[in-house]
Amino acid sequence: MRARETRKNYQCLWRWGTMLLGMLMICSAAENLWVTVYYGVPVWKDATTTLFCASDAKAYDTEVHNVWATHACVPTDPNPQEVVLGNVTENFNMWKNNMVDQMHEDIVSLWDQSLKPCVKLTPLCVTLNCTDYLGNATNTNNSSGGTVEKEEIKNCSFNITTGIRDKVQKAYAYFYKLDVVPIDDDNTNTSYRLIHCNSSVITQTCPKVSFEPIPIHYCAPAGFAILKCNNKKFSGKGQCTNVSTVQCTHGIKPVVSTQLLLNGSLAEEEVVIRSDNFTNNAKTILVQLNVSVEINCTRPNNNRRRRITSGPGKVLYTTGEIIGDIRKAYCNISRAKWNKTLEQVATKLREQFGNKTIVFKQSSGGDPEIVMHSFNCRGEFFYCNTTKLFNSTWNENSTWNATGNDTITLPCRIKQIINMWQEVGKAMYAPPIEGQIRCSSNITGLLLTRDGGGDKNSTTEIFRPAGGNMKDNWRSELYKYKVVKIEPLGVAPTKAKRRVVQREKRAVGVIGAMFLGFLGAAGSTMGAASITLTVQARKLLSGIVQQQNNLLRAIEAQQHLLQLTVWGIKQLQARVLAVERYLRDQQLLGIWGCSGKLICTTTVPWNTSWSNKSLDKIWNNMTWMEWEREIDNYTSLIYTLLEESQNQQEKNEQELLELDKWASLWNWFSITNWLWYIRIFIMIVGGLIGLRIIFAVLSIVNRVRQGYSPLSFQTLIPAQRGPDRPEGIEEGGGERDRDRSTRLVNGFLALFWDDLRSLCLFSYHRLTDLLLIVARIVELLGRRGWEVLKYWWNLLLYWSQELKNSAVSLLNATAIAVAEGTDRVIEVVQRVGRAILHIPTRIRQGFERALL
C-alpha cells in the first residue's frame, strides 16, 4: 500500500522533470561572445616621451638673460586640474625614472646654449705675475665671518693682445686663489696660470646673465599623462595606493648645489629618507626634511668690474678694484634649527639601520665641489665648508632641546672659474659681481653617503655629506611622478555582434560624467567606465587642440631668436607627437570599420583562451587596467583578427553591391520604379502603334502600285457564311439574317483604341491565368505545409508521450525501490529497538532462572 501511495504521489511530477531537463539543455548551450572595440577607455602604460615646460611669465626679470630660458615655455595653467584615481595602485621607481634623465639633459643643454655666444677666455690663458693682496684685512673682526686668509686674493698682471693682433698691452686683475695655480717650472712663486687652462675650454658668461632659479613645470603632451603619488611617507620605490593624474608637475627650481638641497619641496609629515639600496654604501641617501632650515649667505666686500678688451667684440670682465674690507664670504644657519633637524634625520637613520649610533662627519675628500657645499648666490659661486654642520654623534639618548639665537657660521670661498658639472673638458668663468652680495635660501634636503668596509658587528654608522651628481637633485623633486601613455583603445567580449541596421543616435544619459577627467574613471569597473567614453574621447581631442594653441603661442613668442632653445624644440616634438598618436588611433579605428564610434561591435568571435572569465566578472568586478593586463599578450592578435574581419566584410559588401538591384523585391514596388514602368509601357505602346501605322502605309502604297484601289475604311465587308447557311431564302421570302462583318479601322484614334483594347485584353487574360496558377501553387504549398506541420506535431506529441511514460516509469520504479528499502530499514530499526527494550526483561528472567 505504501508503494502504491508513493507511485501516485510521483505520477504528477513528470512535468517538473521535463522542465528541469529543458533548463539543463538551455544552460548547457554555449553562449557566443564577440569582440567589441571601445574608444576612450581609462587605460595607460609606462612610457618614455618628450616633455615640455611651462613657467610663469612674470617669474623672471626681462632686463637680464635668464639661463633657464623660461620665456620659451608655455604659460602655466592658472587652474591646474588634478584628478584623484580612486581604487588604483601603481608602481613607482624614482631611481629608474626617465623624467630625471630628461631634466638633466635639459639643464645641461640650457647651460651650454647660454654660453655659446659668450667670449672664450683663451686670451687669459697666459702667464700671470701675481702677488698677494690683503687690503685692509687687519682692521676687520671675526664677528661676521672672519678675515680672509693669506694669499686668498691675488693681484695679477699679464700681457694681452689688443685689437691689432701683433701688439700687446699690459693689464692687471684680481683673482681668487682657487682660480689660479702656480707654474711648476718657476721657483719665484710669482708665476701663475688660470686653473683648467690646460685641460678645458673656459667660456666667460655673457653680460647680464642670471642664474637665479625659476620654477619649471614639466608637462606631458596630449595622449600622455603624469601620474603623481600622494602617499605622505612614500619611499620613492614600490607601490603607491594614493594616485592622481596631472598634466604638469609642480614648479621645480633647478638649483645646482652639492651636499645640501636648496629651495625644494618638503615632506608633509615627518622626515623621509630614500635610497635605491640602503645596504649598498655606494648608493646616495636622499633626505627630505619636513621643516626647512634657513641659510643666509653674504659676500661683504665690494668689488668693481673692469673691462679688458682683447679684440673686436671680445670684452673680458675682471675684478678691477676692491673697496672696503676684504673679508671671507660666509653663511649663517640657526644652530637650534639645524641640530633639531639632525636629530630627526638621525632618528630615521637609526630606524633603518637597526638602532645603531649615528655619526655625522665631514666629507672624506675629492673635488672642491664635493668636499664643500657649492651653490650659486646672485651670480657668484660659493664654496662653503660644512664641517661645523656634520660633526655630531646621535644615539638613543641624544636629544636637542636647546633654543636660542646662536648661529653656525660657515666660512665660504668664491670661485670664478667653475669646472662644469655637466661634462668633462669644459669650464666657465663667472665675472665678478659688483656690490655686496646677499642671498637667503631654504635647506629642504640632504645628500648623504654611508661609510663602508667596517666591522659588520659595529654599533656605529658614519654618514658624510655627498653630491656632485645633479640627477640626485632633480630626483629629490621628481620622485613622486611618472609618465604614462594613454591607451584609449580597448577590446572586451560582449554578446553583441555587428549588424548592418538602421538605428537612431541617442545621447549619453549620464550628465555628471562630463565633469570627470580623462582618467577619472580608472578605478571604476569596466561597466561603469564605459558610460564615460564620450567625455573621455572629447577630452582627448580637445586637450590636443588646446595644447597645440599654447605651443604655437610660445613658439611665435620666440620667432625673433635665431635659434630655438631646448624648450622650443621640445614643444615642436610634443606637438607632432600628440597629432601622430591621435591619427594612429583614428587609423586603427578606420581599419576596423569603427570610425567615429565609441562602442563598435565586430564579427570576430571571442576566444576563451584569451580570457575565460564570465561577462559578469569582467564588467562588474574588473577595472579597465586589470582587464588590459590580463589580455595584454593577445592584443596584437586581436587587432590582426579585427583587421582581417573588416577586410572580409568590405569584400562581401562589394560583392553584394554588384547584386544590389536584386537584393530586395520590395524595391520593385517603390513609386520611383512605378513611374519608370509607366514610361516604359507608354514607349512600348507607342512603338506598336507606330509600327502598325508604318505597315498600313506600306500596304497601301504596295496596292496602289499594283493598280488596286482600296475600299474605304468606312466600308463594312460581309463575312463569308458557311455552305449550310445560304445567303438567300427560297422564293425570296423571309427575313435576311443579320450580316456579320469585320470592322475596319476608322481613323487614327480608332486604330489606337483598337490596338490598345487588344493589348489590354491580352494582358488581362495572361495576368488572370498567371494569378490562377500562383493561387493554385500557393494552395498546394499551403496544403502540403499544413500536412507537414500536422505530421511534426503528431510526432512531437508521440515522443512527448513516450518521454512522459518513460519518466513516470522511472519515477515509479524509483519510488517503489525507495519505499521497499524504507520498509526494510524501518523493520530493522524496530527489531533493534525491541531487542534493546527486552534486555532488562531477559536479564530479570535470567536472574529468576538462576535463583530457581
Swiss-Prot record:
<dbReference type="Pfam" id="PF00517">
    <property type="entry name" value="GP41"/>
</dbReference>
<keyword id="KW-0165">Cleavage on pair of basic residues</keyword>
<feature type="region of interest" description="V2">
    <location>
        <begin position="156"/>
        <end position="197"/>
    </location>
</feature>
<feature type="region of interest" description="V3">
    <location>
        <begin position="297"/>
        <end position="330"/>
    </location>
</feature>
<feature type="region of interest" description="MPER; binding to GalCer">
    <location>
        <begin position="658"/>
        <end position="679"/>
    </location>
</feature>
<feature type="glycosylation site" description="N-linked (GlcNAc...) asparagine; by host">
    <location>
        <position position="242"/>
    </location>
</feature>
<keyword id="KW-1161">Viral attachment to host cell</keyword>
<feature type="glycosylation site" description="N-linked (GlcNAc...) asparagine; by host">
    <location>
        <position position="263"/>
    </location>
</feature>
<keyword id="KW-1168">Fusion of virus membrane with host membrane</keyword>
<feature type="short sequence motif" description="Di-leucine internalization motif">
    <location>
        <begin position="851"/>
        <end position="852"/>
    </location>
</feature>
<feature type="topological domain" description="Extracellular">
    <location>
        <begin position="32"/>
        <end position="680"/>
    </location>
</feature>
<feature type="glycosylation site" description="N-linked (GlcNAc...) asparagine; by host">
    <location>
        <position position="129"/>
    </location>
</feature>
<feature type="glycosylation site" description="N-linked (GlcNAc...) asparagine; by host">
    <location>
        <position position="155"/>
    </location>
</feature>
<keyword id="KW-0472">Membrane</keyword>
<dbReference type="GO" id="GO:0020002">
    <property type="term" value="C:host cell plasma membrane"/>
</dbReference>
<feature type="region of interest" description="V1">
    <location>
        <begin position="130"/>
        <end position="155"/>
    </location>
</feature>
<dbReference type="GO" id="GO:0019064">
    <property type="term" value="P:fusion of virus membrane with host plasma membrane"/>
</dbReference>
<keyword id="KW-1165">Clathrin-mediated endocytosis of virus by host</keyword>
<feature type="transmembrane region" description="Helical">
    <location>
        <begin position="681"/>
        <end position="701"/>
    </location>
</feature>
<keyword id="KW-0732">Signal</keyword>
<keyword id="KW-1032">Host cell membrane</keyword>
<feature type="glycosylation site" description="N-linked (GlcNAc...) asparagine; by host">
    <location>
        <position position="405"/>
    </location>
</feature>
<feature type="glycosylation site" description="N-linked (GlcNAc...) asparagine; by host">
    <location>
        <position position="385"/>
    </location>
</feature>
<keyword id="KW-0945">Host-virus interaction</keyword>
<feature type="signal peptide">
    <location>
        <begin position="1"/>
        <end position="31"/>
    </location>
</feature>
<feature type="glycosylation site" description="N-linked (GlcNAc...) asparagine; by host">
    <location>
        <position position="355"/>
    </location>
</feature>
<keyword id="KW-0812">Transmembrane</keyword>
<dbReference type="InterPro" id="IPR037527">
    <property type="entry name" value="Gp160"/>
</dbReference>
<feature type="glycosylation site" description="N-linked (GlcNAc...) asparagine; by host">
    <location>
        <position position="457"/>
    </location>
</feature>
<feature type="glycosylation site" description="N-linked (GlcNAc...) asparagine; by host">
    <location>
        <position position="339"/>
    </location>
</feature>
<feature type="region of interest" description="Fusion peptide">
    <location>
        <begin position="507"/>
        <end position="528"/>
    </location>
</feature>
<feature type="region of interest" description="V4">
    <location>
        <begin position="384"/>
        <end position="412"/>
    </location>
</feature>
<feature type="glycosylation site" description="N-linked (GlcNAc...) asparagine; by host">
    <location>
        <position position="607"/>
    </location>
</feature>
<keyword id="KW-1164">Virus endocytosis by host</keyword>
<feature type="glycosylation site" description="N-linked (GlcNAc...) asparagine; by host">
    <location>
        <position position="290"/>
    </location>
</feature>
<keyword id="KW-0946">Virion</keyword>
<keyword id="KW-0261">Viral envelope protein</keyword>
<feature type="disulfide bond">
    <location>
        <begin position="118"/>
        <end position="206"/>
    </location>
</feature>
<feature type="glycosylation site" description="N-linked (GlcNAc...) asparagine; by host">
    <location>
        <position position="633"/>
    </location>
</feature>
<feature type="disulfide bond">
    <location>
        <begin position="53"/>
        <end position="73"/>
    </location>
</feature>
<feature type="disulfide bond">
    <location>
        <begin position="377"/>
        <end position="439"/>
    </location>
</feature>
<feature type="site" description="Cleavage; by host furin">
    <location>
        <begin position="506"/>
        <end position="507"/>
    </location>
</feature>
